[in-house]
From Swiss-Prot:
<keyword id="KW-0139">CF(1)</keyword>
<comment type="similarity">
    <text>Belongs to the ATPase epsilon chain family.</text>
</comment>
<dbReference type="InterPro" id="IPR001469">
    <property type="entry name" value="ATP_synth_F1_dsu/esu"/>
</dbReference>
<protein>
    <recommendedName>
        <fullName>ATP synthase epsilon chain</fullName>
    </recommendedName>
</protein>
<dbReference type="GO" id="GO:0005524">
    <property type="term" value="F:ATP binding"/>
</dbReference>
<dbReference type="GO" id="GO:0005886">
    <property type="term" value="C:plasma membrane"/>
</dbReference>
<dbReference type="GO" id="GO:0046933">
    <property type="term" value="F:proton-transporting ATP synthase activity, rotational mechanism"/>
</dbReference>
<keyword id="KW-0066">ATP synthesis</keyword>
<keyword id="KW-0406">Ion transport</keyword>
<dbReference type="GO" id="GO:0045259">
    <property type="term" value="C:proton-transporting ATP synthase complex"/>
</dbReference>
<dbReference type="Pfam" id="PF02823">
    <property type="entry name" value="ATP-synt_DE_N"/>
</dbReference>
<comment type="function">
    <text>Produces ATP from ADP in the presence of a proton gradient across the membrane.</text>
</comment>
<keyword id="KW-0472">Membrane</keyword>
<dbReference type="InterPro" id="IPR036794">
    <property type="entry name" value="ATP_F1_dsu/esu_C_sf"/>
</dbReference>
<keyword id="KW-0813">Transport</keyword>
<keyword id="KW-1003">Cell membrane</keyword>
<dbReference type="InterPro" id="IPR036771">
    <property type="entry name" value="ATPsynth_dsu/esu_N"/>
</dbReference>
Length: 138
């Protein structure tokens, strides 16, 4: 048994197809969604959408910057501002962005928006976690 999943960013559809299960980071913790799951609407934190395809036993990961999860009887939709396939993430760029943001926080510059920088750091950490999971698949 499976269900239809759509993962959509502001600019394009990242994934659309039948899956056996997914795992996402909701505002209240990790959510595992299986066929026949109860209807649900949840805010998603920056992190990973883990997708499992039973047919070919394929696992796939997508980074999302946060968003909304809607679960209906036969369709699950994830709407995210930013969604990137794990294979398209650039580890060196992520580490550089994270380092620059951390240095901005340490600089004690009163003109910076520390909340925005801390959010950026958390998003970069979430991307690194997605890459760590993908490394385990290899």
């Amino acid at each position: 048994m499976n269900f239809y999943l759509d993962v959509v960013s502001l600019t394009k559809t990242i994934f659309s197809g039948f899956v056996e299960k997914i795992r996402v980071s909701g505002s209240e913790g990790e959510l595992g969604i299986y066929p026949g799951h109860a209807q649900l609407l949840s805010i998603l934190k920056p992190g990973m959408v883990y997708i499992f395809h039973k047919k070919d036993k394929k696992e796939e990961c997508i980074y999302i910057s946060g968003g909304i999860l809607e679960v209906q009887p036969s369709v699950v939709s994830i709407l995210a501002d930013v969604a990137i396939h794990a294979i398209d993430l650039d580890r060196s760029r992520i580490l550089k962005t994270k380092k620059n943001a951390e240095e901005s926080i340490k600089s004690n510059n009163t003109k910076i928006n520390k909340d925005a920088i801390l959010l950026q750091i958390s998003k970069e950490i979430a991307k690194l976690r997605v890459l760590e999971v993908m490394d385990k698949f290899k």
